[in-house]
């Protein structure tokens, strides 16, 4: 990998973004997802997980692909998500971002995958598809 090129890995599975009420129970199956995120705020719980683990009764946005920034991002690094989000915004692609301690994940609608790959590659990103 070129040291100046950021590698992005597209996870194989299809994902959903779900909203639960604050007092709802989080389904146990979610932890079986290859990638998942649980975020709690004073008013809601947001879940990101493989689509096959969602259940009836959730408010759901289906058919998302996950793009993983394939490196450990030091907290001193600035602008990684800003650059990616600007490129995708210029292409009229909506995103949902999840960050972990080590790296960032950008979710895009599955229907936008082809154009997302194209514009990111045109802007110097290395895209790995699984």
Where are these regions (language model features)?
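Regulatory modules associated with amino-acid/nitrogen control
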Residues: 1-91, 115-130
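A cross-kingdom feature marking solvent-exposed beta-strand/loop segments within repeated
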Residues: 91-106, 112-114, 130
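A generic structural motif
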Residues: 44-49, 103-109
């Amino acid at each position: 990998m070129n040291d100046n090129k950021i590698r992005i890995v597209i996870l194989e599975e299809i994902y959903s973004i779900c909203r639960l009420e604050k007092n709802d129970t989080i389904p146990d199956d979610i932890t079986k997802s290859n990638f998942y995120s649980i975020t709690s705020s004073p008013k809601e719980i947001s879940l990101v997980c493989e689509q096959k683990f969602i259940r009836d009764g959730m408010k759901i946005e289906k058919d998302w692909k996950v793009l993983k920034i394939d490196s450990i991002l030091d907290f001193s690094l600035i602008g990684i998500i800003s650059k990616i989000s600007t490129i995708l915004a210029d292409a009229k692609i909506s995103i949902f971002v999840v960050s972990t301690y080590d790296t960032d994940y950008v979710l895009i609608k599955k229907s936008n995958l082809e154009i997302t790959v194209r514009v990111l590659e045109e802007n110097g990103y290395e895209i790995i598809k699984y």
